[in-house]
Regions:
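N-terminal membrane-sensor/transducer module of prokaryotic signaling receptors
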Residues: 2-4, 15-459
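C-terminal region of N-terminal signal peptides and the immediate post-cleavage residues
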Residues: 6-10
């Protein structure tokens, strides 16, 4: 999923059948265990088709039949009305009729809202965290396929990270030359020019041609409408475009909503955006930083492509020498920022800024710390970057031209608050820009608090 900028996904991942042409009467036997998103997509497509043909009540009975075709190992179908009332959930039958619209995952995501938004576009993938009953109720990353049934409710099924590839791993192309940033920009601009000259239909046909001129090693094209529905996909993810998968609520392993973020950039004329790709380097899993570049074609659709940040391409063959590794977790930065926001709301702005400015204060844990900015991008407090206090950073970019503050604010306002940048570790008085996962949260309508963790996640 979202592997633009790589050479191919590893492991199983054949294209699923098209839900638009899947009838309830078509023969279908689910696999013993679902381990890939294409399998999950087909599973949900048949559930939606069955519900359309047989009606809600009969479908609810069928979905809970442990010996039926809508239970595959630990994967089952659930159905929810628009508005958040559960129609049926085979794994949790007691919640039928319950309103789940305000339920959140550990990072504050109202996942039912994300389900509903995606389902209204037809079908798509939604990322969230949920307790896995097969793993003692431990919260795990989960990806759900959701599909509208009749405009009043949707069906869905989810895949936990312990069951399969929620974030598919890829193989980096180590034999071909590594594209530079200017190659990426030129590639996307050439695709935009081609689309504007030749029209949408012809351009999408060429972009989706796995032997066509826009498949150039690591450089491959992805296209979306402004709802986040896929129009063109890499050769190794044909199910995305075949099934018109909506990805507006798909996020990367750190909760960064990649398509939503790039869509927002595209509406403003385009720009750079960071995500990560899961790479298996020898016996190690590394989440390697990737830089994407997006541009609008017109008012109907936009495109992007991406490359591994060049200095990290050597991770592919297993060279981890000198790679900055995280000392903290996403959970830690989320907790620290939320504690700082709560302190500010309880103690007032003056006390909070004084505490944030203290390098030995309660909101500093090594190179995990918080800072504060006003909504116009002016730095109000920082325990280490003292020369920035009072300066407006709204238009500041990293060395690749990615606007750090703007991206963070858009993530805070439109997604879940997580974004990425390349930034020096100021707690260690370093000047080299390294990958940083940032989390930001508003205190009130006038200012916000942010924190971040440096380095790459290595498993």
């Amino acid at each position: 999923i979202l592997a633009a900028g790589r050479t191919g996904a590893e492991g199983p991942g054949a294209a699923a059948s098209d839900p638009a042409s899947t009838g309830a009467g078509d023969p279908y036997t689910p696999p013993e265990a679902i381990t890939t998103t294409p399998e999950l997509l087909e599973f949900v497509a048949h559930a939606a088709a069955y519900a359309r043909e047989h009606g809600r009540e009969k479908a609810a009975v069928a979905f809970t039949d442990p010996n039926g075709t809508f239970v595959a190992g630990n994967t089952h179908v659930f159905a929810v009305e628009y508005g958040g009332t559960v129609v049926v959930d085979a794994a949790e039958p007691g919640i039928r009729g319950t309103d789940i619209s305000n339920q959140t995952d550990p990072f504050g995501i109202r996942f039912a809202e994300r389900f509903e938004e995606t389902a209204r576009f037809g079908r798509g993938y939604v990322s969230y965290m949920y307790p896995n009953p097969a793993n003692n109720g431990t919260f795990e990353h989960r990806i759900a396929v959701v599909e509208d049934v009749d405009g009043t409710y949707y069906v869905a099924a989810g895949l936990f990270a312990s069951q399969g590839e929620v974030y598919p791993s890829v193989a980096l192309n180590t034999s071909a030359g590594q594209p530079a940033l200017e190659d990426l920009v030129a590639y996307v601009k050439s695709a935009v020019a081609y689309a504007r000259t030749n029209g949408k239909e012809k351009a999408l046909a060429v972009f989706n041609d796995r032997t066509g001129p826009f498949v150039q090693g690591e450089l491959v094209m992805m296209a979306f409408d402004y709802n986040g529905t896929n129009l063109a996909a890499p050769p190794y993810s044909p199910e995305l475009v075949k099934n018109r998968i909506n990805l507006i609520n798909y996020y990367d392993p750190d909760g960064v909503y990649t398509i939503r973020g790039m869509r927002d950039f595209a509406t403003e004329g385009g720009g750079f955006f960071y995500t990560v790709v899961k790479v298996r380097a020898n016996d190690t899993v590394v989440y390697v930083p990737k830089i994407d570049y997006a541009e609008p074609v017109d008012g109907d659709w936009w495109i992007f492509s991406g490359i591994v940040v060049p200095e990290y391409a050597r991770i592919g063959p297993g060279n981890l020498t000198g790679i900055p590794v995280r000392d903290h977790t996403r959970e830690e930065v989320y907790d620290l920022v939320n504690r700082a926001v709560a302190f500010a709301q309880a103690s007032g702005k003056e006390a909070a800024l004084a505490e944030i400015n203290d390098p030995a204060g309660r909101f500093v844990n090594g190179d995990l710390f918080v800072w504060a900015e006003s909504t116009d991008g002016t730095v109000l407090a920082d325990p280490f970057w003292k020369e920035a206090i009072g300066r407006n950073c709204m238009n500041d970019t990293d060395r690749n031209g990615m606007p750090i503050t703007k991206v963070g604010i858009e993530a805070m306002q439109n997604a879940a608050g997580f974004s990425r940048a390349l930034f020096p570790n100021t707690a260690a008085n370093e000047t080299a820009e390294v990958p940083k996962l940032i989390y930001m949260k508003a205190v009130d309508e006038t200012w916000w608090i942010g924190g971040g963790i440096y380095g790459l996640e290595v498993e």
